[in-house]
Amino acid sequence: MATKHLFLLPGDGIGPEAMAEVKKLISAMNEKLGSGFATDEGLVGGCAYDAHGAAISDADMAKAMAADAVLFGAVGGPKWDAVPYEVRPEAGLLRLRKDMELFANLRPAICYPALAASSSLKQEVVEGLDILIVRELTGGVYFGEPKQIIDLGNGQKRGIDTQVYDTFEIERISGVAFELARTRKNHVTSMEKRNVMKSGVLWNEVVTQTHKARYADVKLDHMLADAGGMQLVRWPKQFDVIVTDNLFGDMLSDIAAMLTGSIGMLPSASLGAPDVKTKKRKALYEPVHGSAPDIAGKGIANPIAMIASFAMCLRYSFGMVDEADRLEGAIAAVLDQGLRTKDIFSPGMTEVGTVEMGDAIIAKFLG
């Protein structure tokens, strides 16, 4: 069995505590299942700034580039609020995404049955929810040029951001969405604003052409992004895979996340293009939640999003679909048993800490 190389970047705040539970899981899989994982660990975010004066060092960046997959914890905290903008903790994640050319951000929105009552929507609206939002991550208004603030000289200023998409960017992100849909319910909804944006017109055209040429077996719908936001709240279970641009994906994925009852429960993946020779994609997996410095070191952080991110790693980087299914099933089973960390605790449940939750999930996974 070929060795599977993982590079771990726990980061700041609760990142190291959550990552510790994944490290235990990896060790258990190697020992009990012979999974063949090899791990190395580096610094990212504020801790990297403290050690190297940069949000990620060149040496750790090289290790990330060489790994089969990167597991990322969280970055940031008040300690680093005053550091220069270009070396702020978040710059480490941005460099990873840029240098690894991670253009496809996968954001699942899954409502675990045991937590359906925690959603702000009616239980029947969200129970059984399983949506995957595929967000284009390296183009659009966040990266388009010009991007500047101009002094107009009359006491007024003008802020400029530019929304830009080329055909190939839309082709490759829609291709990822269609391929993923084939492994799910075979349904893609593409969202843009073609009624007011030329980039939306092109997006609609290219997605339609890509579908016709290569993925005609997948059901395709188009929806204006603002209507999509409304429909996510009205009846989210109509969706399977949603593909959209960087800006709308940023907004819609957070809307979808809150349907589930706790944004702190959700994983994500960022994928690059397949290597020409190996056909493998560079990939980074991370929980959606932040570094939560207010609870760091207290042993109460919820490790589920980090563990679920590792499940995505098993599925998308290593093709270990059965193991990914079992791990996701173990998370659901532990929640069904009533175990809760502080952030998702409710009366009648059993409150546990970070380590206890991790141990319970690992035991259920291996059992």
Curated annotation (Swiss-Prot):
Belongs to the isocitrate and isopropylmalate dehydrogenases family. LeuB type 1 subfamily. Its EC number is 1.1.1.85. It comes from the Bacteria. Keywords: Amino-acid biosynthesis, Branched-chain amino acid biosynthesis, Cytoplasm, Leucine biosynthesis, Magnesium, Manganese, Metal-binding, NAD, Oxidoreductase. The gene is leuB. One of its GO terms (molecular function) is magnesium ion binding. This is 3-isopropylmalate dehydrogenase. It catalyses: (2R,3S)-3-isopropylmalate + NAD(+) = 4-methyl-2-oxopentanoate + CO2 + NADH. Its cofactor is Mg(2+); Mn(2+). The record marks Y142, K193 as: Important for catalysis. Mg(2+) binds at D226, D250, D254.
